[in-house]
A protein has these predicted regions:
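A structural preference for short, hydrophobic beta-strand core positions in alpha/beta folds
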Residues: 30, 219-222
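FAD-binding subdomain of flavoenzyme oxidoreductases
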Residues: 58-220
Length: 226
């Protein structure tokens, strides 16, 4: 049980909380959507629960030319997807967009949670995992802010972007994230299903479809009789 629950409005408040708690040795537990299956959001030693969902969930910038969106880490998955689907109305965009990331916890998880757990989803075969979508991250840490570079590709390494992703709060509190987004083309969606005589044939067909250089399905499932 936390000693206090804080609901930040902006990045500056988070920075002050992190600095204060670091100085006074107070543990911080960042709460996004609460969908963790590893019990990582439980305040096992008291301290501060930093709840990002209620107020820290805004769009910071939308860039249609580069097809990117920058949001606060507390934004929920459904909120992000609806925002992108309504881009024409909200941002005066030329078309609708999608985030392309739909983990099993989509309805309850936050964008920040996707990044710090290095998540995957049912559409990752086509769009990639979350690390393939992240361009830039901003973190509040006890020693100051960490901002990764916003470039889609770099020749230098190690990649700070990839080091920070999957860290689950070990290096700081993720505040802002810039993601690639994708054009929403519902007219191109087709659904198919096939039945095979046995599991071995199904596996072979699946392997061939993934390796034949004919493009990837957005959602691809191979299931046995059970």
């Amino acid at each position: 049980i936390p000693d206090a629950v804080l609901y930040p409005d902006n990045r500056e408040q988070i920075e002050k909380v992190v600095a204060y708690c670091s100085t006074h040795k107070i543990p911080i537990y960042v709460y996004g959507g609460g969908s963790s299956v590893t019990r990582g959001v439980e305040c096992v030693k008291g301290g501060i629960s930093l709840d990002m969902r209620l107020r820290f969930n805004k769009v910071i910038a939308f860039n249609e030319k580069d097809q990117t969106i920058t949001v606060q880490a507390g934004m929920s998955g459904p909120q992000l997807e609806k925002t992108l689907n309504d881009a024409e109305k909200l941002f005066g965009a030329k078309r609708a967009y999608t985030c392309g990331h739909f983990p099993q916890s989509f309805e309850y998880s936050s964008v920040g949670g996707w990044v710090i757990t290095r998540g995957a989803g049912q559409n990752s075969t086509y769009y990639g995992k979350i690390e393939d979508m992240v361009l830039e991250q901003k973190y509040a840490t006890p020693i100051g802010n960490i901002v990764t570079s916003p470039y889609p590709r770099e020749a230098t390494g190690p990649s700070l972007n990839h080091i920070m992703m999957g860290s689950e709060g070990a290096f700081g509190v993720l505040t802002d994230v810039t993601l690639r987004v994708f054009r929403l083309t519902k007219e191109n969606r087709k659904c198919f299903s096939f039945m095979f005589h046995n599991w071995e044939e199904a596996q072979e067909a699946t392997r061939e479809m993934m390796q034949c250089e004919a493009g990837f399905a957005s959602v691809f499932r191979c299931s046995d009789a059970e």
